[in-house]
Amino acid sequence: MSNVNKVYDWFEERLEIQAIADDITSKYVPPHVNIFYCLGGITLTCFLVQVATGFAMTFYYRPIVNEAFASVQYIMIEANFGWLIRSVHRWSASMMVLMMILHVFRVYLTGGFKKPRELTWVTGVLLGVLTASFGVTGYSLPWDQTGYWAIKIVTGVPEAIPLIGAPMVELLRGSASVGQFTLTRFYSLHTFVLPLITIVFMLMHFLMIRKQGISGPL
């Protein structure tokens, strides 16, 4: 017996790896499933690409109002393959939004939101909201004219709400006006808070799909 087999047997004895693998590979797939049922998986793939490329850019990006734009320029012009990483990040973000929208339409048109899959639908809708939030927060991080005015408009929307509007605006911006605190908050949301929440809801979403299976045809 080779050392590799000994190591495998050691883990197998404690974790029952083969049983887990058999459970994953032997899951029943209904005959009506087609390529359109892969849209959710493609959305997940885009998210993983976002995580990888976004993590790579954190080594160079500086969330400081006076340096953010220059750091993005450095990524695009001077950093090795920086232009490629940022371009992949941008295009995979657009692809993720598109695949998510198509996935929602597919689920709705095939009745995948009906009993007993209501909670799966709810978590999916929440993931859609989180995806849109990624777009809003990430759009402003270059801190160019487009990003600055976008963040100013977005954070100013709650101001129309009576009584709580002004405090909500200040909470989003971190101060009375758009500035360093705003950029810091949006950077934290985009790189830590939103990814963490998204991963939690994705796990819930996938576990429910795993438990309930794929919905049948109409």
UniProtKB/Swiss-Prot annotation:
Cofactor(s), by name: heme b; heme c
Organism encoding this protein: Cuscuta gronovii
Residue numbers binding heme c: 38
Pfam families listed in its UniProt record: Cytochrome_B
GO biological process: photosynthesis; respiratory electron transport chain
Location relative to the cell: Plastid thylakoid membrane
PANTHER family recorded: CYTOCHROME B (PTHR19271:SF16)
Binding sites annotated in the UniProt record for heme b 1: 103, 205
An annotated Gene Ontology molecular function: oxidoreductase activity
Keywords annotated in UniProt: Electron transport, Heme, Iron, Membrane, Metal-binding, Photosynthesis, Plastid, Thylakoid, Transmembrane, Transmembrane helix, Transport
Cofactor binding, note field: Binds 2 heme b groups non-covalently with two histidine residues as axial ligands. Binds one heme group covalently by a single cysteine link with no axial amino acid ligand. This heme was named heme ci.
Gene that this polypeptide is encoded by: petB
A GO CC term assigned to this protein in UniProt: plastid thylakoid membrane
Recorded family membership: Belongs to the cytochrome b family. PetB subfamily.
Transmembrane segments: 35-55, 93-113, 119-139, 189-209
InterPro entries: Cyt_b/b6_N, Cyt_B6_PetB, Cytb/b6-like_sf, Cytochrome_b_N_euk/bac, Di-haem_cyt_TM
Name the UniProt record assigns to this protein: Cytochrome b6
Coiled coil (residue ranges): none
Biological role stated in the UniProt entry: Component of the cytochrome b6-f complex, which mediates electron transfer between photosystem II (PSII) and photosystem I (PSI), cyclic electron flow around PSI, and state transitions.
HAMAP family named in the record: Cytb6_f_cytb6
